[in-house]
């Protein structure tokens, strides 16, 4: 009896399953005819009734095996037909019921042969130009979600149906509705994971639609496309990597960080897991390393972490080849950047072994017409150099050529990255190598970018390696074709950077090249028209003085001014106003201070040669201006050593005298003004003895008297003052004939248009009168003095009270010579004056003086 009982119990589940299936079949059979009715409302009500039945069937605890038969036999074919129903509501309910049925069915994969063609038919467009068969966006989304569900439930069973699935996905990936595209991306990735052994046969057909969608306006769609592409290629054909690289590279410029993060993660995943990844190392590595320079710390951290894993994995896979390098690890190069951590051996080897393939593309992109491309390529270059280290030597020529071009970029970010790259070259490459190339480049065509590269490599170079080359570099920089290669401020600024870099790196080692450095700095100060640059050059000169261990830049000039002037003045015969040599000469004269007095043997002969009437007038004006400034401070300039008197004859006879001669023209007048100003500065200083002033007067008095008629007010004023000075120092020793020629010329200046000139002339006339007072035979001058009295009395009635006051003082002082004569002359004209006040004051003064006598 026991055996039949056990059989009955075992059969019970089967009976229950059959009973449930039969009951479900009966329930469905009552509703199915409603699906065939022509009434849209009738079909909808039938579908709604079916929905209630199915929701009851899929309740927890329901038997999926009992559901499988009625579902596959009765419902599935009818629901699939209803996906094409004219009524949108019926199609939506049909899709929903299919979703419920797939989730409940015991063997959902059995539905795939009928489901996938139906989905493909509703999603795939027969032609790209035509709209999809399913016009409703929400329904298309539901159909793609249904396809995704089928992929998740069907797994490897989808392999025979890949064509239909891929056809539907291609349409979904290009759907106008963004949500459909995102769902399509997720479904494509799921399909790749579900059919790893067969997916490669269809994967390439998805790449085209994915790449068409990768620039979609919604960033979430772009992220989904990138992630889906990563999975599709991972499980599909590696040949598609070439098709997506340019699109991925473009996404690294995306404004949305999540998109760049997705590219970084996918590329890193490929480098770790792609089956034939070794074939694409040189293509994928630049993409991952580009994220090292991303503005977002999270992306940089992701890229760094992935790259470390890639390098470590490659190192482990190639351990046999790297055995020696692993056993005898090389230390970091000297002067290794402090803020950089050295990449692992695997990472360094990966870059080094692929550098020849990567560099040409980087060097091409760094000069691209698109700004973003140039910036990215420039940022990548220092990252590569940091990995390649001294292996960059074999590629140095192409890198330097690229940097030379890129450093002219208007984008500061590009130039900044190039500077960083050049500094790394200085760190990793021997100076013998990079100097040979860079100096040859500068010798061939000096440029601002070439100098910037040189300054940068010097900054990155270790001091002990650079020390033997300091003099060579400084000498090359001091060559005319480089230090005088351009007057452009940017060029000069980069030239200054070279000097600053050498002083900063080599410090005391620069003493041997101090003269060359000074010459370069003087050139920069001479040629530059930017005040800021001149200040920087002066500050650098102070640094050079510190390196030389001397107190100041003035002492630096004192040490080298002789050699500088000797080299510089050798070509003075070829100078013009804009000659660099002349500009340098003027800088030395104005900046060297007391050192000028130690090099008069070069300064004065050069001035004599350049200040001849036959030379460039504008150059003469410039030099006279500088000479005048020096003569105003002789103890701090030309006479600092008390040697200027030895060159006085040359200054007076060969420089001043020729330039005081009258010549027609405004320029000639300006030169006379400059020359007379120099003469005034000379004789008003304390460096000349009375005898030397007398000698100057004997030589120059005729020319100075002639300049009293000059058109320039300044010239006339200076001439009056000079004559006054000559008379004070040597008037009583002049020959009578020459002495008498002075006062008529001064009298004419009392009618000058300038009151300053008139007053200076009056002062000189007073000095002339005092000179007669000191002479023994003053009676011989009575007629001349009487004439002078008469003329001065005319100006005593001048409209200008200041002139009247000045003339009155002259007459009072001069009355001591011949007071009776002056009284007669005054009384003769007093009634002619508009006001007798000044004449009465003069007469009163003479009466007082007579009483005192």
Swiss-Prot record:
It is found in: Cytoplasm; Cytoplasmic granule. The modification N-acetylalanine is found at residue 2. The keyword Repeat applies. One of its GO terms (biological process) is outer dynein arm assembly. GO terms for cellular component: cytoplasm; cytosol; dynein axonemal particle; mitotic spindle; nucleolus. Interacts with DNAI2; probably involved in outer arm dynein assembly. InterPro entries: ARM-like, ARM-type_fold, DAAF5, HEAT_DAAF5, TOG. Expressed in ciliated cells including ependymal cells lining the lateral ventricles and multiciliated epithelium of oviduct ampulla. This is Dynein axonemal assembly factor 5. It comes from Mus musculus (Mouse). Pfam families: HEAT_DAAF5. Cytoplasmic protein involved in the delivery of the dynein machinery to the motile cilium. It is required for the assembly of the axonemal dynein inner and outer arms, two structures attached to the peripheral outer doublet A microtubule of the axoneme, that play a crucial role in cilium motility. Belongs to the DNAAF5 family. Keywords: Acetylation, Cilium biogenesis/degradation, Cytoplasm, Repeat. GO terms for molecular function: dynein intermediate chain binding. Coiled coil: none annotated. HEAT repeats lie at residues 69-107, 200-238, 240-276, 278-316, 374-412, 597-636, 694-732, 736-774, 782-820. It comes from the Eukaryota. The lineage of its organism: Eukaryota, Metazoa, Chordata, Craniata, Vertebrata.
């Amino acid at each position: 009896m026991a055996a039949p009982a056990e059989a009955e119990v075992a059969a019970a589940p089967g009976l229950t399953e059959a009973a449930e299936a039969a009951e479900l079949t009966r329930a469905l059979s009552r509703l199915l005819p409603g699906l065939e009715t022509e009434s849209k409302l009738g079909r909808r009500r039938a579908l709604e009734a079916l929905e209630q039945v199915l929701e009851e069937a899929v309740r927890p605890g329901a038997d999926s095996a009992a559901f499988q038969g009625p579902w596959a036999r009765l419902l599935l074919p009818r629901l699939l037909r209803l996906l094409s129903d004219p009524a949108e509501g019926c199609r939506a309910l049909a899709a929903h019921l299919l979703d419920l049925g797939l989730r409940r069915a015991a063997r959902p994969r059995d539905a795939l042969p009928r489901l996938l063609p139906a989905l493909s038919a509703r999603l795939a467009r027969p032609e790209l130009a035509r709209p999809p068969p399913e016009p409703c966006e929400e329904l298309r989304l539901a159909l793609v979600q249904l396809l995704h569900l089928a992929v998740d439930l069907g797994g490897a069973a989808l392999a025979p149906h890949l064509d239909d699935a891929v056809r539907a996905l291609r349409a979904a990936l290009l759907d106008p509705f963004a949500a459909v595209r995102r769902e399509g991306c997720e479904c494509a990735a799921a399909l790749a994971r579900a059919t790893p052994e067969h997916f490669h046969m269809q994967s390439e057909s998805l790449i085209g639609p994915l790449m068409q969608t990768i620039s979609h306006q919604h960033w979430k769609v772009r992220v989904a496309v990138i992630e889906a592409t990563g999975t599709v290629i991972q499980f599909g054909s590696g040949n598609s990597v070439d098709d997506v690289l340019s699109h991925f590279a473009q996404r690294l410029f995306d404004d949305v960080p999540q998109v760049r993060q997705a590219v970084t993660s996918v590329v890193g995943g490929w480098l770790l897991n792609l089956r034939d990844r070794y074939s694409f190392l040189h293509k994928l590595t630049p993409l991952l390393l580009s994220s090292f320079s991303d503005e977002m710390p999270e992306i940089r951290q992701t890229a760094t972490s992935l790259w470390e894993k890639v390098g470590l994995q490659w190192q482990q896979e190639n351990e046999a080849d790297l055995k020696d390098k692993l056993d005898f690890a090389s230390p970091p190069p000297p002067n290794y950047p402090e803020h950089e951590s050295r990449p692992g051996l695997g990472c360094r080897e990966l870059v080094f072994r692929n550098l020849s393939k990567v560099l040409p593309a980087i060097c091409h992109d760094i000069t691209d017409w698109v700004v973003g491309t140039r910036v990215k390529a420039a940022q990548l270059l220092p990252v590569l150099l940091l990995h390649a280290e001294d292996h960059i030597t074999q590629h140095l020529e192409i890198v330097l050529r690229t940097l030379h071009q890129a450093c002219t970029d208007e984008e500061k970010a590009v130039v900044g990255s190039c500077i960083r790259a050049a500094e790394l070259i200085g760190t990793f490459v021997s100076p013998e190598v990079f100097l040979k190339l860079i100096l040859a480049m500068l010798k061939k065509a000096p440029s601002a970018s070439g100098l910037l590269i040189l300054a940068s490599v010097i900054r990155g170079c270790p001091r002990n390696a650079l020390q033997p080359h300091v003099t060579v570099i400084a000498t090359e920089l001091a060559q005319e074709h480089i230090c005088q290669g351009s007057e452009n401020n940017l060029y000069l600024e980069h030239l200054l950077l070279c000097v600053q870099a050498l002083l900063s790196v080599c410090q005391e080692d620069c003493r041997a090249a101090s003269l060359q450095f000074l010459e370069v700095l003087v050139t920069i100060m001479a040629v530059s028209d930017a005040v800021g640059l001149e200040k920087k050059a002066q500050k650098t000169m102070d640094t050079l003085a510190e390196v030389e261990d001397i107190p100041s830049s003035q002492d630096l000039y004192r040490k080298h001014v002789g050699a500088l002037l000797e080299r510089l003045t050798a070509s003075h015969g070829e100078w013009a106003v804009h000659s660099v040599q002349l500009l340098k000469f003027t800088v030395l004269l104005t900046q060297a201070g007391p050192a000028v007095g130690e090099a008069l043997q070069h300064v004065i002969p050069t001035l004599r040669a350049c200040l001849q009437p036959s030379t460039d007038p504008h150059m003469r004006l410039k030099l006279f201006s500088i000479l005048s400034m020096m003569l105003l401070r002789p103890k701090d300039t030309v006479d600092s050593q008390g040697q200027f008197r030895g060159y006085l004859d040359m200054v007076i006879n060969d420089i001043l005298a020729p330039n005081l001669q009258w010549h027609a023209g405004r320029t000639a007048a300006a030169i006379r003004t400059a020359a007379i100003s120099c003469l005034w500065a000379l004789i008003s200083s304390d460096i000349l003895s009375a005898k030397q002033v007398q000698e100057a007067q004997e030589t120059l008095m005729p020319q100075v008297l002639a300049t009293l008629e000059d058109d320039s007010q300044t010239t006339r004023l200076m001439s009056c003052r000079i004559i006054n000075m000559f008379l004070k120092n040597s008037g009583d020793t002049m020959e009578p004939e020459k002495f008498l020629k002075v006062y008529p010329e001064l009298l004419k200046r009392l009618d000058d248009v300038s009151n300053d000139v008139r007053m200076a002339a009056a002062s000189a006339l007073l000095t002339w009168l005092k000179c007669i007072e000191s002479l023994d035979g003053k009676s011989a001058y009575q007629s001349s003095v009487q004439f002078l009295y008469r003329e001065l009395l005319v100006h005593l009635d001048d409209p200008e009270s200041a002139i009247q006051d000045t003339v009155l003082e002259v007459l009072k002082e001069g009355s001591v010579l011949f007071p009776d004569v002056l009284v007669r002359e005054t009384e003769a004209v007093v009634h002619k004056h508009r006001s007798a006040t000044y004449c009465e004051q003069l007469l009163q003064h003479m009466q007082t003086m007579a009483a005192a006598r």
